[in-house]
């Protein structure tokens, strides 16, 4: 059982569900106080949304590991996973991933709405059939993978609102831009592993990581104005505006440091900052929602 759980990548799934929940809450009508806001929450629909999205995310993770099992065997970081280590056979992992994915789609379709199920299906398909094969061909795969990676809040928003508005795409944009410093820093730290597996991440084709550091800074700069848009649209207030600006500058600072001193220590600093940034900005966004 533990090996099957590991196939679902629980830590990544938790991040996905956090983003889905934020999207759901911002898809609800604005309320004048917390009591009214809580009354607007359809707990059963929220539960179906979380379960369905979690199943699709888990199924996608399992299918991704099934597809990459041979490459994972060549990487120190992933050689101990259930498939390359031989603890699970490929056929069972494939069946497990397919079953979870289908169950997640059905859960969203029947328990929530067709729109959220469709977005979930698009997320799975684009991740598995576009991003995953591209990883061995070009470092631009990170850009392609950031699209399905930013879809969880859109699923949540569609589940609550029954449609998509500019607010849902603002949440998408924040998560989309956030992924580049996050994943480039991971690829930087494990570039030798990725090279052994033949995965064309940017730090692999950019051995001195000069371009990688530049990309981290560029996306850090871009994230700051985009992260302020929720305040301009009335999704959040002044507290969020100030907090998002400070968080963005902090995130950018970690990127500038790695650009000035291209070391593993600085790359790890970007990773740690990115992991802290997302829940902090989500928390501020929700805490400072107008009327609450």
Swiss-Prot record:
GO terms for cellular component: plasma membrane. One of its GO terms (molecular function) is protoheme IX farnesyltransferase activity. Converts heme B (protoheme IX) to heme O by substitution of the vinyl group on carbon 2 of heme B porphyrin ring with a hydroxyethyl farnesyl side group. Its main location: membrane. Its EC number is 2.5.1.141. It is found in: Cell inner membrane. This is Protoheme IX farnesyltransferase. It is a multi-pass membrane protein. GO terms for biological process: heme O biosynthetic process. Belongs to the UbiA prenyltransferase family. Protoheme IX farnesyltransferase subfamily. The gene is ctaB. InterPro entries: Protohaem_IX_farnesylTrfase, UbiA_prenyltransferase, UbiA_sf. It comes from the Bacteria. Carbon 2 of the heme B porphyrin ring is defined according to the Fischer nomenclature. The chain crosses the membrane at residues 12-32, 43-63, 94-114, 115-135, 144-164, 169-189, 216-236, 239-259, 267-287. Keywords: Cell inner membrane, Cell membrane, Heme biosynthesis, Membrane, Transferase, Transmembrane, Transmembrane helix. It comes from Solibacter usitatus (strain Ellin6076). It catalyses: heme b + (2E,6E)-farnesyl diphosphate + H2O = Fe(II)-heme o + diphosphate. The lineage of its organism: Bacteria, Pseudomonadati, Acidobacteriota, Terriglobia, Bryobacterales. Pathway: Porphyrin-containing compound metabolism; heme O biosynthesis; heme O from protoheme: step 1/1. CDD domains: PT_UbiA_Cox10 (cd13957). Pfam families: UbiA (PF01040).
């Amino acid at each position: 059982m533990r090996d099957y759980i590991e196939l679902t990548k629980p830590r990544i799934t938790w991040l996905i569900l956090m983003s889905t929940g934020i999207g759901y809450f911002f898809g609800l009508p604005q309320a004048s106080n917390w009591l009214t806001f809580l009354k607007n929450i359809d707990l059963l629909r929220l539960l179906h949304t979380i379960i369905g999205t979690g199943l699709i995310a888990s199924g996608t993770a399992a299918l991704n590991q099934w597809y990459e099992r041979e490459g994972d065997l060549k990487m120190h970081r992933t050689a101990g996973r259930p498939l390359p280590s031989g603890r699970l056979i490929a056929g069972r992992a494939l069946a497990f991933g397919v079953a979870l994915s289908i169950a997640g789609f059905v859960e969203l379709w029947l328990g929530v709405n067709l729109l959220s199920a469709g977005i979930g299906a698009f997320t799975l398909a684009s991740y598995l059939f576009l991003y995953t094969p591209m990883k061995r061909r070009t470092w631009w795969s990170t850009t392609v993978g950031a699209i399905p990676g930013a879809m969880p809040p859109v699923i949540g928003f569609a589940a609550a609102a029954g449609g998509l508005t500019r607010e849902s795409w603002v949440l998408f944009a924040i998560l989309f831009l956030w992924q580049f410093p996050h994943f480039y820093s991971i690829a930087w730290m494990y570039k030798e592993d990725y090279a052994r597996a033949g995965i064309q991440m940017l730090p692999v084709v950019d051995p001195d990581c000069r371009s990688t550091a530049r990309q981290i800074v560029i996306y850090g700069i871009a994230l700051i104005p985009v992260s302020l848009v929720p305040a301009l649209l009335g999704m959040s207030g002044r507290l969020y505006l100030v907090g998002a600006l400070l968080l963005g500058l902090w995130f950018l600072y970690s990127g500038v440091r790695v650009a000035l001193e291209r070391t593993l220590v600085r790359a790890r600093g970007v990773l740690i900052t990115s992991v802290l940034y997302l829940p902090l900005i989500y928390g501020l966004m929700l805490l400072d929602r107008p009327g609450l």
